[in-house]
Amino acid sequence: MDTVSLPQLPATVLVTIAKLVAPADLVSLCDSHPQLVFLRLYLPEFQDIPVGSFRKYGPSDGHFCPELYFTSPVVHQRVGSITLTFRWKDQGFGNRKGMLWIELVREGQLIATSKDDFPTLAPHQEETQEIVIRNHPVVDLIRKGDTINFMRNVGGGGGHSLSVQEFNAKLELYKY
């Protein structure tokens, strides 16, 4: 039996394979041979990361007490923008300290953060937010293999809480 390399397969077979494999595997396949680059057309344009909801109470001491909310799956494509949508509010009175932001992480090292550029504090009354991040280092510097940390600060000092409902992150992905 003769051996056939992937680039020698008919385009219809390669397209079928591209439609069936996970995006991370398709990126690896495309990177494996110059004649397979056309299969990038079958990469997704968006990646939704639905997370859900939480209600968190802050510690009795401290003011800024950042913590990891969750980490994204490993990114396999370049990213054009990140859109965060959610409903949120704090405890409803007193000082406002609740915050959400993202951090770009590569091999365990912080590369960029959006904390100082999107310093919105949670309101006393529930609000719906849509934050679109583009042309910012947390997006522009993303490379294959990176992760995105989604961070939160409830705020310390007693009585602080942060409630986030229906949190979703949507990554706009580049195919090339």
Locate predicted features:
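Solvent-exposed, flexible loop/coil segments flanking beta-strands in beta-rich domains
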Residues: 37-99
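Glycine-centered loop/turn motifs
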Residues: 124-128, 141-147
